[in-house]
From Swiss-Prot:
Entry GO MF terms: DNA binding; sigma factor activity
DNA-binding region, residue intervals: 332-351
Species assigned in the record: Bacillus subtilis (strain 168)
GN (gene name): sigA
The protein, known as: RNA polymerase sigma factor SigA
Assembly notes: Interacts transiently with the RNAP core.
Length: 371
C-alpha cells in the first residue's frame, strides 16, 4: 500500500489524467469518487476538473457516482424507484405542444396490452434463450411507463418527445438486464433505468451551458429541498434555511442557485400566436429614445439655420472646431492649417462667430433645447 502511495505521488497531474482516461475508455465508465481519489494529491481548480470531465465525455467515457456504478440497481434503489403510475393516462402534460406524429405515437402505444407478472417472467425466460421477438414484446408493453415517467421531467429544458426517446433507451437497457429470478416486477426494475437515462440526458443536453452530472444531481436535490420548505413554510425559503436542511454553507447554496440559472433566448416566442419574441420587449439601454432622437433632429435643424446667418468662413471654423459634421473636434492649429492662417487668427474668427450666436436674435432659437 505504501509503495502504491509513493508511486502515486511520483506521477504528474497529466500522467494521472492519462491513466484515468485509458481506464475509462476500456470500461466505458469512470466514477467521480475514483477520479477524486486519484487527484487528491494535486491542487486543482474546479475549472480544470470541469474541463477534464468535458474531455472524458468527448472520449465517450460516462461519468457516474459510485452508487450508480453497479450493473444493476440494488434493493434500496429499486424500493425508491417503485411507484404507482397510471399507465392508462397517455394525456399530454399541460403547456406541452405536440404535433401529429407524437399524437399518433401515444395512440399507438395505448393499443398495446399490458403484461401480467407471469407473462413478464415468460418473456424474460425466452429473452435469455435469445428470442428477439420476446424482447420487442416486453419493451412495447412498457412504452406507456416511459411516457408516464417522462411527464415528470417536462420543463427541464428538453422537448417531451426527446424525453420519451431517452426513456425508451433506458427501457431497452432494462429489457437486456432484467433478471426475473430476483423477484421484483419488471416495471419496478425498468423505472430505475428509464429515470437514469432521462436525468443523464437532461444533464448532458438540456442546458445551453453544460453542467457536470454531479452538479446537476446537487441542483436537483436543492430544488427538491426548496419545494419541500416552500410547502412547510408557506413562503420561499432563504439560502440559510436551505443550507441547514442540506448540511451546506449558505454561500455554497447561493453558488449552486447561481449555477442553476438558465439563460433565456431572446428569440423565445411570446404571445398566443408566437408572433413576437422576447427580444422585442427588452429595452436597448444604449439606443437613443424616440423623444431624444426627435429633439436632436430639431436641434440640428435649428443649428443649421443659425449657422447659415454667419459668414462661410465663420461657419466652417465653428464646424471644424466643435466637430459638428463628423464628431471630431480640431485644435486652433489644425483649423489654421486648413485655412492657411495662424492659430491666433482662427481664435479671433471663432470668438467673433460665438459673439454673433449669443445675440438674442439667434440664441433664443437654441435656448429651448438647453432646458
Amino acid at each position: 500500500m505504501a509503495d502504491k502511495q509513493t508511486h502515486e505521488t511520483e506521477l504528474t497531474f497529466d500522467q494521472v489524467k492519462e491513466q484515468l482516461t485509458e481506464s475509462g475508455k476500456k470500461r466505458g465508465v469512470l466514477t467521480y469518487e475514483e477520479i477524486a481519489e486519484r487527484m487528491s494529491s494535486f491542487e486543482i481548480e474546479s475549472d480544470q476538473m470541469d474541463e477534464y470531465y468535458e474531455f472524458l465525455g468527448e472520449q465517450g467515457v460516462e461519468l457516474i457516482s459510485e452508487n450508480e456504478e453497479t450493473e444493476d440497481p440494488n434493493i434500496q434503489q429499486l424500493a425508491k424507484a417503485e411507484e404507482e403510475f397510471d399507465l392508462n393516462d397517455l394525456s399530454v402534460p399541460p403547456g406541452v405542444k405536440i404535433n401529429d406524429p407524437v399524437r399518433m405515437y401515444l395512440k399507438e402505444i395505448g393499443r398495446v396490452n399490458l403484461l401480467s407478472a407471469k407473462e413478464e417472467i415468460a418473456y424474460a425466460q425466452k429473452i435469455e434463450e435469445g428470442d428477439e421477438e420476446s424482447k420487442r414484446r416486453l419493451a412495447e408493453a412498457n412504452l406507456r411507463l416511459v411516457v408516464s415517467i417522462a411527464k415528470r421531467y417536462v420543463g427541464r429544458g428538453m422537448l417531451f418527445l426527446d424525453l420519451i426517446q431517452e426513456g425508451n433507451m433506458g427501457l431497452m437497457k432494462a429489457v437486456e438486464k432484467f433478471d426475473y429470478r430476483k423477484g421484483y416486477k419488471f416495471s419496478t426494475y425498468a423505472t430505475w433505468w428509464i429515470r437514469q437515462a432521462i436525468t443523464r440526458a437532461i444533464a448532458d443536453q438540456a442546458r445551453t451551458i453544460r453542467i457536470p452530472v454531479h452538479m446537476v444531481e446537487t441542483i436537483n436535490k436543492l430544488i427538491r429541498v426548496q419545494r419541500q420548505l416552500l410547502q412547510d413554510l408557506g413562503r420561499e425559503p432563504t439560502p440559510e434555511e436551505i443550507a441547514e436542511d442540506m448540511d451546506l454553507t449558505p454561500e455554497k447554496v447561493r453558488e449552486i442557485l447561481k449555477i442553476a440559472q438558465e439563460p433565456v433566448s431572446l428569440e423565445t416566442p411570446i404571445g398566443e400566436e408566437d408572433d413576437s419574441h422576447l427580444g422585442d420587449f427588452i429595452e436597448d439601454q444604449e439606443a437613443t429614445s424616440p423623444s431624444d432622437h426627435a429633439a436632436y433632429e430639431l436641434l440640428k435643424e435649428q443649428l443649421e439655420d443659425v449657422l447659415d446667418t454667419l459668414t462661410d468662413r465663420e461657419e466652417n471654423v465653428l464646424r471644424l472646431r466643435f466637430g459638428l459634421d463628423d464628431g471630431r473636434t480640431r485644435t486652433l492649429e489644425e483649423v489654421g492649417k486648413v485655412f492657411g492662417v495662424t492659430r491666433e487668427r482662427i481664435r479671433q474668427i471663432e470668438a467673433k462667430a460665438l459673439r454673433k450666436l449669443r445675440h438674442p436674435s439667434r440664441s433664443k432659437r437654441l435656448k429651448d433645447f438647453l432646458e
